[in-house]
Amino acid sequence: MREAVVAGALVVAGLNAVPSLVGGWVWYRGERADPGLARLFWLMLRVGQGSAVAFALAVGSLAAAGHTASESLFYLYALLPLAVAFVAEQLRVASAQTILDQRGLPDAAAVGQLPEQEQRVLVGAILKREVGVMSLSALVVVFLALRAAGTAHGF
């Protein structure tokens, strides 16, 4: 049983490492980044998040069936990625408002009143910040999943 839990944690780490690296590249390149790569980042990020949810459900099912880890830290590492993803999504939403506030715009509707070039610059800044936040969250999930794999004892 331990091998399956470790394998699951490693799959979660791998599925989150890829969007973390791709997102870091997209963030670094900014507006020069390939739009297809940016779309791929969001798809891979959601797959990574889904894997973390599936792993948490599997671990919860094992615990409900009486197969528990001997080290309670394992559960922290296995379940914390869900909280990280939730907080990251909130930060992603707040990052858009932060950019609007920096430019003195009250809401997203005000962006439509700007000239097209300014709209593009503003949207690019928002997307860059969102990608940065989410790729860092994926990196944190990688760390937590690797720690879960390292503490999966007693199954």
Task: List each model region and its residues.
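Polytopic transmembrane helical bundles with strong interfacial aromatic enrichment
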Residues: 1-155
